[in-house]
Regions:
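Proteolytic processing junctions in secreted/extracellular precursors
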Residues: 2-13
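Long, well-structured alpha-helical subdomains associated
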Residues: 106-140
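OB-fold/S1-family RNA-binding modules
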Residues: 49-53
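Post-HEXXH active-site segment of zinc metalloproteases
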Residues: 69-70, 85-119
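Short pre-active-site segment immediately N-terminal to the catalytic Zn-binding motif
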Residues: 58-75
Length: 140
């Protein structure tokens, strides 16, 4: 019985996350798709989300968030990447992103964590959460 209740709870939680993701993407008027996946093609296994620029799809892990805020900020971080691709175009954005990674390498820092586009996405996600979504979806 406990196993069945746990599975039902996880399904309900996932349905809530799908609803939240759809509402937030609509808020930014993006054609970007959001899919839930337990693993991603690239990056490390600790990532909670990734943006596939070629297919304009955000992949989000369906579990592992301590709060709804954590989930929303992860989604917003990936939405920031999507908005930049739509603003600059794929080719130009990838060039800018790669250049920022090379600068980080040159400075002896991590290509991902020291990449200015990743730092901008993280800051933007936190700002947007406070501005628009803090009181919209509640942690239960």
């Amino acid at each position: 019985m406990k196993k069945i209740l746990t599975e039902i709870h996880l399904l309900m939680e996932r349905a809530d996350l799908v609803y939240i993701a759809d509402e937030i993407v609509k808020h930014y008027n993006l054609p970007t798709k959001v899919k839930f996946s337990k693993s991603f093609k690239r990056k490390n296994n600790n990532d909670k989300g990734t943006y596939d620029w070629e297919n304009d799809t955000i992949f989000i892990k369906p579990q592992g968030y301590k709060t709804v805020k954590d989930f929303i900020e992860t989604l917003l971080h990936e939405i920031h990447h999507a908005t930049r691709v739509h603003r600059y175009g794929l080719k130009k954005f990838l060039k800018k992103y790669a250049q920022a990674g090379q600068v980080a390498d040159y400075l002896g820092k991590d290509r991902y964590f020291a990449n200015k586009w990743e730092r901008k996405a993280e800051g933007w996600a936190q700002h947007e959460y406070k501005r628009y979504f803090k009181d919209k979806f509640f942690d239960v």
